[in-house]
Curated annotation (Swiss-Prot):
Complexes and interactors: Homotetramer. Forms an RuvA(8)-RuvB(12)-Holliday junction (HJ) complex. HJ DNA is sandwiched between 2 RuvA tetramers; dsDNA enters through RuvA and exits via RuvB. An RuvB hexamer assembles on each DNA strand where it exits the tetramer. Each RuvB hexamer is contacted by two RuvA subunits (via domain III) on 2 adjacent RuvB subunits; this complex drives branch migration. In the full resolvosome a probable DNA-RuvA(4)-RuvB(12)-RuvC(2) complex forms which resolves the HJ.
Region: Domain III, residue numbers: 144-214
Region: Domain II, residue numbers: 64-139
One BP term from GO: DNA recombination
GO cellular component: cytoplasm; Holliday junction helicase complex; Holliday junction resolvase complex
Keyword tRNA processing assigned: no
HAMAP family (alphabetical): DNA_HJ_migration_RuvA
Protein's name in the database: Holliday junction branch migration complex subunit RuvA
Domain comment as written in the entry: Has three domains with a flexible linker between the domains II and III and assumes an 'L' shape. Domain III is highly mobile and contacts RuvB.
GO molecular function ontology, one term from the record: four-way junction helicase activity
Region annotation Domain I: where it falls in the sequence: 1-63
Species the sequence originates in: Clavibacter sepedonicus (Clavibacter michiganensis subsp. sepedonicus)
Listed NCBIfam families: ruvA
Entry keyword DNA repair: yes
Length: 214
């Protein structure tokens, strides 16, 4: 089993990290929030969970033990697969997850794309008493990045796009900023996301794009 990897970041695209370890490149699935912390050419260490399927082997990577444990606990919940678990961690860090479970706040999980009311309730029920944060992370760049991406997604939804389309565009915009080493602030992400959506723009989007360019 591969429990961790340490090496050089060759690329970060969307939710895929390519990490070179002793000449071998490993493709690792990460959250967009985690991807924003990684830079091309830098050294990085990720804790990993290997998910084995009949036709595939997929590595999921995390910045710390709390994220890894939260991911594995989520994957143990009925109806939650690895991709859905990663989506939850994009919206809620382990500390926020623990607080939501303790408060029986299933609404916090319903906000995650792909998590319905029934699954959200199961998460709260099945994770009760299991989530403990051992290394609280300071709410610095990663937390700020998550807030910014959520705000941009909300803005795009308000302009008429579906949550799925909006989130995909923002994730791609955030990944592009990370690859170029540029700050992922709200004006930049909104401008780039609108540019990616292009011809799909609903009424009112062009004005928002002009506002973002100012």
């Amino acid at each position: 089993m591969i429990s961790s990897l340490r090496g050089t970041v060759l690329s970060v695209s969307g939710q895929t990290l390519l990490l070179e370890v002793h000449g071998v490149g490993y493709g690792v699935s990460v959250t967009p929030r985690h991807a924003l912390e990684l830079r091309h050419g830098s050294e990085a260490t990720v804790l990993t969970s290997l998910v084995v399927r009949e036709d595939s082997l997929t590595l999921f990577g995390f910045p710390g033990p709390d994220e890894l444990r939260a991911f594995e606990l989520l994957c143990g919940v009925t109806g939650v697969g690895p991709k859905s678990a990663l989506a939850v961690l994009e919206h809620l860090d382990p500390e926020a997850m623990a607080q939501a479970v303790a408060a029986e706040d299933d609404a916090a999980f319903r906000r995650v794309s792909g998590i319905g009311p029934k699954t959200a309730k199961l998460i709260v029920l099945q994770l009760a008493g299991k989530l403990f944060v051992t290394q609280p992370r300071t709410r610095s760049a990663s937390s700020a990045a998550s807030t910014v991406t959520a705000d941009v997604v909300t803005a795009l939804i308000g302009l008429g796009w579906s949550e799925r389309v909006a989130r995909t565009a923002v994730d791609d915009a955030a990944a592009a900023a990370a690859e170029q080493g540029l700050p992922a602030d709200m004006p930049r992400l909104l401008r780039v996301a609108l540019g990616m959506l292009g011809p799909q723009q609903p009424a009112g989007a062009p004005a928002a794009a002009q506002a973002a360019d100012r």
